[in-house]
């Protein structure tokens, strides 16, 4: 049997309100592309990117979930099997930041107890329109014992760093004996309906 082209498979989720830039972050990382004309994501889509970390080839399966309230019943099932979750807010949108607490509760309710979480304050290139200080982002992350980055999908600021940090944190929690298991337990579950359309930047 031919060897798989990767050693481990990690399922990651991008969670947050609509319009915070989840899809732009995803496409910046997966394709090094940025498009300001993305329409709002309908349902759920995912991208694949394989990275090298600590001498291992890790296949990242990154799911882009719609943030609108009406889609919560759809996204809930996608928490299952997630090993890492990025909670994204827009530094120019106070409501999207306030809702991070709600998303954290949602994760606590539906995701695995040992899932690795990270908070991203996106659109840090728009400092003239900032309404959420970096300190507030750092504090909510610190309060929940999770890591934090400010990112810009537009200017490609800290996007790669965030994904690599999340993958490294997941890898650090996994003993070597789980390598084979990780290949098989987080294979893609096809959603009933997918869209390749994007979200906002």
Curated annotation (Swiss-Prot):
Disruption phenotype: Intestinal cells exhibit abnormally abundant rab-5 and rab-7 positive enlarged early endosomes, which accumulate basolaterally recycling transmembrane cargo molecules and fluid indicating a block in basolateral transport. On the other hand, rme-1 positive recycling endosomes are missing. No endocytic trafficking defects in oocytes or coelomocytes. Almost complete loss of cnt-1 endosomal localization in the intestinal epithelium. Overaccumulation of endosomal phosphatidylinositol-4,5-bisphosphate. Nearly complete loss of basolateral endosomal tubule extensions of the intestine. One of its GO terms (cellular component) is Golgi medial cisterna. The keyword Membrane applies. Its main location: membrane. Almost ubiquitously expressed. Expressed in intestine, hypodermis, seam cells, body-wall muscles, many neurons, oviduct sheath cell, spermatheca, coelomocytes and pharyngeal and nerve ring. GTP binds at residues 16-23, 64-68, 122-125, 152-154. It holds the Pfam family Ras. It catalyses: GTP + H2O = GDP + phosphate + H(+). It is a lipid-anchor. The keyword Protein transport applies. Its EC number is 3.6.5.2. A motif (Effector region) lies at residues 38-46. Belongs to the small GTPase superfamily. Rab family. Interacts (GTP-bound form) with ehbp-1 (via C-terminal coiled coil). Interacts (GTP-bound form) with cnt-1 (via C-terminal ankyrin repeat). Interacts (GTP-bound form) with rab-5 GAP, tbc-2 (via putative coiled coil domain). Interacts (GTP-bound form) with amph-1. This is Ras-related protein Rab-10. It comes from Caenorhabditis elegans.
């Amino acid at each position: 049997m031919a060897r798989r082209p990767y050693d481990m498979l990690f399922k990651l989720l991008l969670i947050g309100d609509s319009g915070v830039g989840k899809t732009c972050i995803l496409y910046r990382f997966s394709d090094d592309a940025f498009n300001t004309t993305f329409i709002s994501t309908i349902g759920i889509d995912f991208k694949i990117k394989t990275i090298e970390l600590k001498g291992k080839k890790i296949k990242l399966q990154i799911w882009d979930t719609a943030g609108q309230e009406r889609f919560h019943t759809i996204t809930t099932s996608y928490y299952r099997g997630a090993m890492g979750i990025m909670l994204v807010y827009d530094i120019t949108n106070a409501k999207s930041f306030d809702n991070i607490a709600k998303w954290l509760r949602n994760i606590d309710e539906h995701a695995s107890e040992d899932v690795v979480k990270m908070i991203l304050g996106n659109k840090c290139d728009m400092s003239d329109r900032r309404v959420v200080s970096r300190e507030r982002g750092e504090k909510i992350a610190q309060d929940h014992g999770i890591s934090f980055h400010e990112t810009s999908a537009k200017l490609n600021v800290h996007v790669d760093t965030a994904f690599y940090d999340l993958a490294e944190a997941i890898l650090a929690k996994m003993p070597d004996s789980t390598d084979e298991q990780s290949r098989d337990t987080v294979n893609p579950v096809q959603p009933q309906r997918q869209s390749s359309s994007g979200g906002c930047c």
